[in-house]
Amino acid sequence: FLQVAANFANDYSDGIRGTDEGRAVDSARSFAKTPSAESTSTPEMLPASQPQHGPARLVASGVSPKKVLAAAGINALIACLCGLAVVALTGYWWFILVGIACLVAGWCYVGGKHPYGYHYLGEIFVLVFFGLVATCGTMFALAGTISTEGMLGGANVGLIAVAVLCVNNLRDVETDRTHGKHTWMTALGRRNGTVFAIALLSVAVLLLAAYILLLSTPAMPTIAILAVTCAMCAAAAVAIARKKYGEALPLCTFSSLALAATYVCCVVFA
């Protein structure tokens, strides 16, 4: 729910700032066809100056900013209630401070007068909160401790989360530059940014593989799911290299799920 709240908040903030203006809507019209091309089914790419296609933004599509902000608030409230339930069950009252930090980080990403997502810090905060804080916090709530495996798992999940953000920012690199939104992708450029995003996925897989190889006798289910994770990350990397960002995003997401499943297998079959 906190993730959903952050997405609504980002849509609201970017919408009222005008950052989402001119961004294309995700559809099958990512190719323009000439009359002669229609008969041969050969697509002609749109000029490079036109914006990359992405999902529709709510505020930019005409939805009332107040409604989007209300949706963010409702999901944040549900997240808070879930967090308070965890606190009540575990007795770890300091989790409230962690929750407050997560709420502030979610809003200040692109909200407020000085959003850190506009000043090259978005990737770092995503690594910390979507990776280490989320994973290690969950582990501590369940087990009362944080192990080396938990830290490594948090780093891996965080790397893939940053890769997802990089794919989004690669798609929007031109419009972000126009509206003064400074991300690592606007600094690196599309070519170097593509290499960086692929490197993030590669490092995540290599860390996971190294951990599994350090096990005395990795179980076959663990190796099998590791292979699936590698395949998904490879497919995502190919999609990123081909600038098919709409395909790369779900592949990165499923790679994160497969990575988590691999760690579960490591624990179950240890």
Q: Which positions does each model-derived feature cover?
A:
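Extended hydrophobic alpha-helices typical of membrane-associated regions
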Residues: L213-A270
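C-terminal ends of transmembrane helices
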Residues: A6-D11, R57, V104-G117, L165, ...
